[in-house]
Curated annotation (Swiss-Prot):
GO biological process assignments: microtubule-based movement
Signal peptide (residue range): none
Keyword terms of this UniProt record: ATP-binding, Coiled coil, Microtubule, Motor protein, Nucleotide-binding
Binding-site positions, ATP: 106-113
Protein name: Kinesin-like protein KIN-7H
One Pfam family here: DUF3490
Lineage top rank: taxon: Eukaryota
Gene for this chain: KIN7H
Stretches assigned to coiled coil: 351-436
């Protein structure tokens, strides 16, 4: 343990180390030599001692023959050497602020007092030498001494021999009360105090030793060091440490020491305290978890911090080599073997004073100020090579990053190019698809509808022409409508104006081919009704074009659950009527030219109207095969005949009558014969009384709601037309949307028109649908006998909407009938000559139209029978619809209505999880949407009536469902799952009623789709239909509302579930 420099003797701080154990064997004394005693122990090297005598077989199994320690001193070693190699490093650590202790343990007369006296003197000499070398710090040495005699603590520096008490201090540990502590002035003062301690200590004579120590002596030296003011060292704090020099009394046997009386009593206390010390060392060497009896002895209590606490410890065990003390020597070596396994944790004891702290802060402040004044002086010169190497590494790193970024840039550019190419390809495909659809639609419509032309009478020359109409061709498509195909009575496919065949004052319109008696279409109306159509006819061209674009932006929807108010056609002022033009065969002699939408169309009214009646207008379109002069002559002749015919049917002013001329026959003809009949009609100058709806005002057949009478008009649907259900919740809605152009969609449509229909209940609609499914529709065209004196009753008659759900388009046997049954009375005051001429004209037109229609249907029989079994839902699915966008819109609207109508959360969750965007789910979404709208309207109607019981009951049922879900959380979710849910939903784990809070938050924010999705998943998990296979969409109509396994007995709950299930 020798060192070259005393400055290196500073012990470690805060590190664990074991007790340094060394053994010193003394030589044989005079008494042992006089008895011719021989030594049995021998030191073979500096760390090992062996038992030299031969052991018996039984002793070899009990005791080892060799012992190894940190250091072994032979009898030839002096005390200075023992100090230097066995105790100096531990004792000298006190000057660096670490506590230390040095023990001397052994049997009586083994040389403990002799060894400790020399180690104490040598340690003080070294400490004073260190103080003289380090003038930068101020050292203060304090000395105290005590002895433990017969388990009593006595102060060796005081003449008072009364025992002292031991106290426990939380910072210092066990302290001795009223112990004298002297401050050492110098070396001589220390020697004087040692002399006093030697004189005060209890000693006695025994058979083994003439001067035997009868007590345990503890000499304590406390060293405090403080940095001086002129010192520039950063060690500004105060270091405080204590070193203990412990000279234990030797263990002895009464048989050997021949003690009696007081010596025997003293020996008993010594052996008891040494036995406690051995027990503490043995337990500390094995484990520190059990109880360690430090308080069983005053010695172990005082030395508690030295044995296993905050101190460095060195034990010097002394022994005698004589054979007579072999058992005592073996016990000493066993104690030393256990002691070297004990671990201590020494730390530096730092005490910082306020004065030292202030000085340190002032010094730091001055240093920082100097650096701010001269920053250049504080620059640190670094190694140039290391700096360049670091910079090179940074450059290489940056180069790699630049290379990676360049690769990413190239990849991004290539991806952008690919995306642009894909977008261009998609646009080209869309254009090709659109052009293909448009061509196919044009071909379909051209083969489906005839060409008609509108002429006016010569009496309307002085009327003011209205604004022309410009229809954009690209806006007319099967999907260019704001409403569904079921909301339109007439499906107008195209608007084109023939500049060659029509003058600016002529009105071109093409309507679906209908088998209608011409005498049933001769309609007159009141002035008030005609005024509405006058306003409709003066729409600006750009307004019409915008409406056509709006039609293309909306998808077809099902509106079977609502009814729309429809009024009769009013044409006091001739309405603008434009429709699709059929491409006639090249071989047809009467082929007409296709009209274009860019040319203006004028609408005029008769000049010589004597009362508010409506002139019948024939809607046709012909090709100018003759000279323009001849065409004008023909037009004049036709207008004269129209004037004559219309003037012969006067009507009352306030009454709407339907005039039926018996001379006219049904308009039943083939498409080929229809052109011929139109040509013949122009030649004989007989104007047909045909009424056509306006293309931009398809819903202009609306009569005023306050009207009591109207003329009925019965129209029979041709097999080339498809039925459509026209519905609306209120008449005000219809009036607002009456200007919306009709859409094209290849669906059946029912030819219906209703009088004064303002609101239809869904239950009545359901009954109406039952009638549709159970009633067979007429299979033959309506025929009516034409009588000159027949009058029609104009009283109010209901409108019958009848169509079989399975009715297929283009089937003659299943064709539905669009009827406007009318009744009333109208007096016909016409001259017999005019009636005969009109009847002849109508009969010619009727026969021509019938023959033409038969040929047309025969040519299209293949397509009609092919489409007879077409599924209307499949047609709806096959349309070019942006379904994902439409699905999200329907889903959000349904979720919002769920919230408004207080729908059961189980139903919401089941519906939300079942329908996830499949295009075939459109029907179920439409049904659910209409159901919810009806519930909302029912709630509103009940609220207006002062009855809110339905909404209140639904709210109560929803509250009970939330309470039930909170109960299901306790049953079906584990504690860990519930805590995770609470944290995910922002509910504190330390709050009350957490499950109720979570249940109240479910389906509370209907605008957040993430919240809706989480709510549906949780409700589904609690109700048990998330993990199981969901009911198929085909069965959802039956299982419309999910019912939990154990429904509550409450009748309110049952009523709410049933109302949600079957409404």
């Amino acid at each position: 343990m020798t060192t070259e420099d005393d400055d290196q003797m500073l012990g470690p701080s805060g590190t664990q180390e074991k007790i340094y154990v060394s053994v010193r064997m003394r030589p044989l004394n005079d008494k042992e030599k006089f008895r011719n005693d021989v030594p049995d122990w021998e030191c073979i090297n500096n760390t090992t001692i062996i038992y030299r005598s031969h052991l018996s077989i039984s002793e070899r199994s009990m005791y080892p023959s060799a012992y190894t320690f940190d250091r072994v001193f032979s009898p030839e070693c002096c005390t200075r050497q023992v100090y230097e190699q066995g105790a100096k490093e531990v004792a000298f650590s006190v000057v660096s602020g670490v506590n230390a202790s040095v023990f001397a343990y052994g049997q009586t007369s083994s040389g403990k007092t002799y060894t400790m006296s020399g180690i104490t003197d040598c340690a003080l000499v070294d400490i004073y030498g260190y103080i003289d070398k380090h003038k930068e710090r101020e050292f203060i040495l304090k000395f105290s001494a005590m002895e433990i005699y017969n388990e009593s603590v006595r102060d060796l520096l005081s003449t008072d021999t009364s025992p002292l008490r031991l106290l426990d201090d939380p910072e210092k540990g066990t302290v001795v009360e009223k112990l004298t502590e002297e401050t050492l002035r110098d070396w001589n003062h220390f020697k004087e105090l040692l002399s006093v301690c030697k004189a005060q200590r209890q000693i006695g004579e025994t058979a083994l030793n003439e001067v035997s120590s009868r007590s345990h002596q503890i000499l304590r030296l406390t060293v405090e060091s403080i940095a001086r003011e002129f010192s520039t060292n950063d060690k500004f704090s105060t270091l405080t440490a204590t070193v203990n020099f412990i000279d234990l009394a030797g263990s002895e046997r009464a048989s050997q020491s021949l003690s009696a009386g007081t010596r025997l009593k003293e020996g008993c206390h010594i052996n008891r305290s040494l036995l406690t010390l051995g027990t503490v060392i043995r337990k500390l060497s094995k484990e520190k978890t059990g109880h360690i009896p430090f308080r069983d002895s005053k010695l172990t209590r005082i030395l508690q911090s030295s044995l296993g606490g905050n101190a460095r410890t060195a034990i010097i065990c002394t022994m005698s080599p004589a054979r007579i003390h072999v058992e005592q020597s073996r016990n000493t070596l066993l104690f030393a073997s256990c002691a070297k396994e004990v671990t201590t944790n020494a730390q530096v004891n730092v005490v910082m004073s306020d004065k030292a702290l202030v000085k340190h802060l002032q010094r730091e402040l001055a240093k920082l100020e100097s650096e701010l004044r001269s920053p250049s002086q504080a620059s640190i010169v670094s190694d140039t090579t290391a700096l360049l190497t670091e910079k090179d590494l940074e450059v290489e790193k940056l180069k790699k990053e630049v290379f990676q970024l360049a690769q990413q840039l190239e990849q991004a550019r290539s991806e952008i190019k690919d995306l642009r190419r894909m977008v261009e390809e998609e646009k080209n495909q869309e254009k090709e698809t659109l052009s293909t659809e448009t061509e196919g639609l044009n071909v379909l419509m051209e083969h489906q509808y005839p060409k008609l032309r509108v002429r006016r009478t010569w009496d309307s020359e002085n009327t003011t022409p209205l604004s022309p109409i410009s229809a954009h061709r690209s806006s007319i498509s099967p999907r260019s409508t704001e409403y569904s195909y079921e909301e339109n009575v007439f499906q107008l496919s195209d608007f084109r104006i023939d500049s060659a065949s029509s003058s600016p004052q002529q009105l071109a319109f093409v309507t679906p081919f209908l088998k209608v008696p011409l005498d049933d279409i001769h309609v007159t109306d009141t002035v008030d009704q005609s005024h509405v159509h006058k306003e409709e006819a003066i729409e600006e061209p750009h307004v019409q074009e915008e409406r056509f674009y709006e039609m293309a932006e909306h998808t077809d929807g099902n509106s079977e659950d609502n009814c729309r108010e429809v009024r009769c056609i009013e044409t006091e002022k001739s309405d603008i009527s434009i429709g699709p033009v059929e491409n006639m065969p090249e071989s047809s002699p009467d082929k007409y030219e296709a009209v274009t939408a860019e040319e203006p169309v004028s609408v005029t009214e008769p000049k010589n109207l004597q009362h508010p009646t409506e002139e019948a207008v024939c809607v046709t379109e012909t090709k100018n095969l003759q000279h323009p002069t001849e065409a004008e002559n023909e037009e004049e002749e036709e207008e004269e005949r129209v004037k004559e015919v219309s003037g012969a049917s006067p009507e009352p002013k306030q009454e709407s009558n339907l005039t039926k001329n018996p001379a006219l026959c049904d308009l039943e003809c083939s498409p080929d014969e229809f052109d011929t009949s139109m040509s013949n009609l122009s030649r004989i100058s007989t104007p047909p009384a045909l009424i056509t709806p306006s293309p931009e005002k398809p819903f202009s057949w609306i009569m005023e709601r306050d009207s009591q009478l109207f003329r009925g008009m019965k129209l029979t649907r041709s097999r080339s037309c498809r039925p459509s259900l026209l519905s609306s919740p209120s008449s005000s809605w219809l009036e607002k949307d009456a200007d919306t152009p009709p859409s094209w969609y290849d669906k059946e449509f029912i030819k219906t028109a209703e009088r004064n229909l303002t609101m239809c209940d869904i239950k009545n609609q359901r009954l109406l649908q039952d009638e549709f499914s159970g009633r067979s529709m007429p299979t033959t065209w309506f025929e009516r006998s034409l009588s000159d004196t027949q009058t029609v009753d104009a009283a109010s008659h209901g409108v019958s909407n009848e169509m079989s759900p399975n009715e297929s388009p283009f089937r003659p046997s299943d064709a539905s009938v669009f009827e406007l049954q009318t009744s009333g009375r109208a007096s016909i005051s016409q001259d017999r000559t005019e009636e005969t001429a009109a009847q002849k004209d109508k009969q010619i037109i009727h026969r021509s139209m019938e023959e033409r229609e038969q040929k047309f249907l025969a040519s299209n029989s293949t397509k009609s029978f092919k489409d007879a079994a077409m599924d209307p839902i499949q047609d709806y699915l096959d349309t070019a619809l942006n379904w994902p966008v439409e699905f999200k819109r329907l889903q959000r609207e349904i979720i919002e209505l769920w919230h408004v109508c207080k729908v059961s959360m189980a139903h919401r969750s089941y519906f939300f999880l079942l329908f996830r965007g499949d295009q075939k789910d459109c029907l179920y979404l439409e049904v659910e949407l209409r159901r919810l709208k009806y519930i909302r309207e029912s709630f509103a109607q009940n609220s207006n009536d002062g009855n809110n019981m339905t909404l209140i009951s639904c709210t109560r049922a929803l509250t009970r469902e939330r309470y039930k879900l909170s109960k299901l959380m306790q049953r079906k979710l584990s504690k860990e799952e519930r805590e995770n849910l609470f944290l995910r939903w922002g509910i504190g784990l330390n709050t009350n009623h957490r499950r109720v809070q979570l249940a109240r938050r479910l389906w509370s924010d209907y605008k957040d789709m993430g919240h809706v999705r989480e709510s549906a998943s949780l409700v589904g998990k609690l109700n048990g239909f998330v993990d199981m296979k969901l009911t198929s969409t085909e069965m959802f109509g039956v299982n419309y509302a999910f019912r939990p396994p154990r429904p509550k007995k409450s009748s309110l709950w049952k009523r709410s579930v049933l109302s949600l299930s079957f409404l």
